[in-house]
């Protein structure tokens, strides 16, 4: 099973790239984890936000292909680390790849939300999108460590 983090936005600060990469490289070969960056639509004074969201959503769904789509969204379901580990095991048993979608400043398009099989809430707080990349990478790595009895996670 491959996991993709499909996120709107490019040109992240170095600390984001380093933080994400620190956890991405720890994933086992049989469960590769990759980042797919989607260019953000140009937002200006008279920007057509619904159209921008639609275009970003189309690109995200195209990148996801036939993967199980899981949106990261505040109204999604909050999972504890242990619950995320259970989800990870369920996804592995399902056999499909997983695409985790992170929207841009205005969130996800209605099409992305409609295509999602699950929605995951990292927090009721609004988090900066660059930080979400690092949090998701660490959370998934920690969940994997639970499923394999790796010593990274401690109770």
UniProtKB/Swiss-Prot annotation:
Its EC number is 2.1.1.177. The keyword Iron-sulfur does not apply. Coiled coil: none annotated. SUPFAM superfamilies: alpha/beta knot. GO terms for cellular component: cytoplasm. Gene3D superfamilies: 3.40.1280.10. One of its GO terms (molecular function) is rRNA (pseudouridine-N3-)-methyltransferase activity. Keywords: Cytoplasm, Methyltransferase, rRNA processing, S-adenosyl-L-methionine, Transferase. Homodimer. This is Ribosomal RNA large subunit methyltransferase H. It comes from Aeromonas hydrophila subsp. hydrophila (strain ATCC 7966 / DSM 30187 / BCRC 13018 / CCUG 14551 / JCM 1027 / KCTC 2358 / NCIMB 9240 / NCTC 8049). The gene is rlmH.
């Amino acid at each position: 099973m491959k996991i993709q983090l499909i996120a709107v936005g490019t040109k992240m600060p170095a600390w984001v790239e380093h933080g994400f990469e620190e956890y991405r490289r720890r994933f086992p070969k049989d469960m590769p984890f990759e980042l797919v960056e989607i260019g953000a639509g140009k937002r200006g004074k008279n920007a057509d936000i619904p159209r921008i969201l639609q275009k970003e959503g189309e690109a995200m769904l195209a990148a996801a292909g036939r993967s199980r789509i899981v949106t990261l969204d505040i109204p999604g379901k909050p999972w504890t680390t242990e619950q995320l580990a259970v989800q990870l095991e369920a996804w592995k048993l399902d056999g499909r790849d997983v695409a985790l979608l992170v929207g841009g400043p205005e969130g996800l398009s209605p099409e992305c939300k409609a295509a999602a099989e699950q929605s995951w809430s990292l927090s009721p707080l609004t988090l900066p999108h660059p930080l979400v990349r690092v949090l998701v990478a660490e959370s998934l790595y920690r969940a994997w460590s639970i499923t394999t009895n790796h010593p990274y996670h401690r109770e």
